[in-house]
Amino acid sequence: MSLSKEILKKIKETSPLSQCVLQILRITSKEDYSLSEIVKIVECDSVLTANVLRVSNSAAISPARPIISINMAISYLGEKMIVNTALSTCANQFFNKKLEGYESPKGELWLHCLMTAIAAKIVSKNSKTPINSNIVYTAGILHDIGKSVISSMLSGTSEKIVSGILEHKYSNYLEAERDILGFDHCEVGEALAIHWKLPDYYRYAIKLHHAPSGAEAEFAPLCFAVHLGDILSMMNGAGTGSDCLQYEICKEYENYFDISGNDIPNFIMIADNEYNIVKEALNF
């Protein structure tokens, strides 16, 4: 990966995810973790504690009785919603920006990543090999973090890029980013994941979500799941502005998932229902 001094400086200056959020991401990606581990982490962060209790008592979740402790909240919400809540606490910092370079309004990146995560997890249930659905979900949330770093550098280019794709100058939006900047949002997202010291599977899912066929065997099912989740999210209208549906689907997903074309509308319907519930619970 060859990134300019300017972009490396931007990455180094990017505020890190809180230690609390990083610990939650690491723990929930393990096969053998306990509820008490998550409780201890959440209870150390007053903002996250307040958000978890708010979400667990929201109208969208509708608990049968008030949830008054973190232990109750985490038992009731489950890992997926805890990851959502943890990352939503830093959404303003990374996901909730207006992406000027993509002509994408404030908040759209977060909603796209949320829909991608939900769709990717649904897709992962059809994997031909075992795959950790918690890792798939979190990778879906994180896959486009590079956009928040490079967006300002692409300001005013979207019309040129879309025209270039229509005129077959570029095969997709990623190629155009590389032509204009010398790198793309996937490479920058990977660099950010390395800077944050995220586990390798998140790094590769971020780097290869538009080119999953380039993944090593160990990471291929994860990268393809996020790739498909991203495509389904855009098909459902949850994109990030000018690059929406400006990428090809990698047909090699058939090597990793038992999915037919007839499954797609059903996946989108299930994902959209869950997406609306989560969005309401998180107050986005």
Feature locations, PLM:
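Terminal helices and disordered tails flanking the catalytic cores of nucleotide-processing hydrolases
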Residues: M1-E6, K251-F284
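Compositionally biased, intrinsically disordered low-complexity regions enriched in proline and serine
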Residues: E103, S171-L174, E254, N276
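Conserved alpha-helical "signature site"
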Residues: M1-I145, V149-T157, L166, Y173-Y247
